[in-house]
From Swiss-Prot:
PANTHER family: LIGHT-INDEPENDENT PROTOCHLOROPHYLLIDE REDUCTASE IRON-SULFUR ATP-BINDING PROTEIN. Transmembrane segments: none annotated. ATP binds at residues 12-17, 41, 182-183. The lineage of its organism: Bacteria, Bacillati, Chloroflexota, Chloroflexia, Chloroflexales. This is Light-independent protochlorophyllide reductase iron-sulfur ATP-binding protein. Binds 1 [4Fe-4S] cluster per dimer.
Amino acid sequence: MSLTLAIYGKGGIGKSTTSSNLSAALALKGAKVLQIGCDPKHDSTFALTGTLQPTVIDVLTEVDFHHEEVSVEDVVHTGFAGVDTLESGGPPAGSGCGGYVVGETVKLLHEFGLYDKYDVIVFDVLGDVVCGGFSAPLNYADYGIIIACNDFDSIFAANRLCLAIKQKSARYRVELAGIIANRVDYELGGGTTLLEQFAETVGTRIIGRVPYHDLIRRSRLMGKTLFEMEGPGKEECTAPFLEMAEELLNRPRSTVPKPLGDREIFNVIGGWR
């Protein structure tokens, strides 16, 4: 059975860039990887393929949602390091339910038998929305992973995601592997001080620290992974992903988080420095 990861975090926190580089690192460690983008923007896998690929919803719409007329090749495309990629897509802006599309994508995965083909499946999930459809990847995941940075809004969203994982863990096998600290800046951003206090409070840990570096910004613009980039800082930027990949492949320590109440976290974060 595949190791299945569901990656969440506040909108704009860098989930797609982080997920793509983690998928690349897992592949470079020898794993056969499928990354699934669960966002109507359908740009999750851009860094792996260098293009915006057709989405599941695009393909299903063309065949009037007759699943039997869709092949694996219609929706799965191979990117850097042999990582296979799939974009679920979503309805037009202002209409429909994006969560429904995630459900359709999961259904297709089962019909294609893809869960048995891959060593690792990575779900890159829309923002901090954890309504029914967008929380569906947690039903299938071994581990949830939260991406956050060292600020209030990010930590508030992370706490809500901890609540979703806790609720899902009562019925499914999923637990929280930990938090990936993104855009870590020890000079201007306080490093990971707040995140470390939050992680300890809810009973988890930081599993990786990704620096705030211009190489990461440029890689996203160019549609490349960090492993394909050249220039100062490459090793600093790629090392955290290789370290996380190694730990995840060896099944990391995980927990069922103990989230704070919304009002409580407002009070608690205000007391952290």
